[in-house]
């Protein structure tokens, strides 16, 4: 065991303390039949320079594709200041504090995150963050059930299918009934929603922009929810709020979403960042942590964890949620991103997403064999249909250096051969034109 920095004399002292003479005696209870009995078949050790060269060779095998994929996870530009500040040891190594008032810096960072989410959504209070957008939506549904004392949730079919799957998992354990609202031309059918919104409904969930990128009639849908004395729950893309109306403006009671777009890379699927914002009347029903601002005994500003109705602090059956952690580091990244971009910066990002997506949609829809599926207004995602299977299109595009065309038929059988394209501010006109040229060649 040469990798352990002990001398032979020190090893003998430790063996003597164990009542052994040789190292092998420590493993005497391991049958000989299961022992290896030979040296490990490992290559020779490498010098540091050799390791770097080997890793570069492995990295060189990766395929770098220009991405036009989205469907809930988006590639946005991240200012360098985000990574620089995030990597500071004061933040990077700190878990959510168990003696919170000692960690005033961490609590202030979370407080700033909550404040920014409230400003984005136009609502009164936000939590310290959640695991991801899907769990945030499911938790909001439980808030609606607790607040109204009803056990039925209406959720539009235009909401991200993976979010709906997580919601279904939550609902089974809580005895919550789910009903899906059908679609009309890629958006929630408001007439169907009005018929479904009865006196037993606790909440109505819509996504804006929805999974197809379409802009929903959120004000009308929220009004229908309120007529049934249910809560209106909006699932939003935070970047889109640089241009679109905030949930608070159209009367939503709760706003949830995925914060990955705010300064967090794609990370091969995680960790991501869920957020929940709500009206003040719901503050005591919110899950997880909330950081509040107060004054200490000397009258100085101080931050505390407040309203911790979590299963770790009270009787489990009385808790509002089993959520017992958050995504503080990812929330810090979102906070730094929003502070760096500012109001006008976020508006510029949203504007570029909108303009570039419409440019790409116009170019692609003009190709022979390509048909736009929906005609409503959209933000930065759109749906096109081709004569080829989505798998064929995706494979051929990958051969041309593009990751594009999410297969909607996976979740919507009626959308066979329909592809979801996403364009964010990081894509250039040249990349969009190259995608169009590649599609033209594939469909020829």
UniProtKB/Swiss-Prot annotation:
UniProt keyword list: Oxidoreductase
Keyword Oxidoreductase: yes
Swiss-Prot/TrEMBL GO biological process terms: glycine decarboxylation via glycine cleavage system; nucleoside metabolic process
Annotated GO MF terms: glycine dehydrogenase (decarboxylating) activity
UniProt cross-references to InterPro entries, sorted A to Z: GcvPA, GDC-P_N, GDC_P, PyrdxlP-dep_Trfase, PyrdxlP-dep_Trfase_major, PyrdxlP-dep_Trfase_small
Pfam families: GDC-P
Superkingdom classification of source: Bacteria
Top enzyme category: oxidoreductase
E.C. code: 1.4.4.2
Catalytic activity reported: N(6)-[(R)-lipoyl]-L-lysyl-[glycine-cleavage complex H protein] + glycine + H(+) = N(6)-[(R)-S(8)-aminomethyldihydrolipoyl]-L-lysyl-[glycine-cleavage complex H protein] + CO2
Function: The glycine cleavage system catalyzes the degradation of glycine. The P protein binds the alpha-amino group of glycine through its pyridoxal phosphate cofactor; CO(2) is released and the remaining methylamine moiety is then transferred to the lipoamide cofactor of the H protein.
Self-association and partners: The glycine cleavage system is composed of four proteins: P, T, L and H. In this organism, the P 'protein' is a heterodimer of two subunits.
Homology family: Belongs to the GcvP family. N-terminal subunit subfamily.
NCBIfam families: PRK00451.1
Name this protein carries in UniProt: Probable glycine dehydrogenase (decarboxylating) subunit 1
Organism expressing this protein natively: Moorella thermoacetica (strain ATCC 39073 / JCM 9320)
Taxonomic lineage of the native organism: Bacteria, Bacillati, Bacillota, Clostridia, Moorellales
Gene encoding the protein: gcvPA
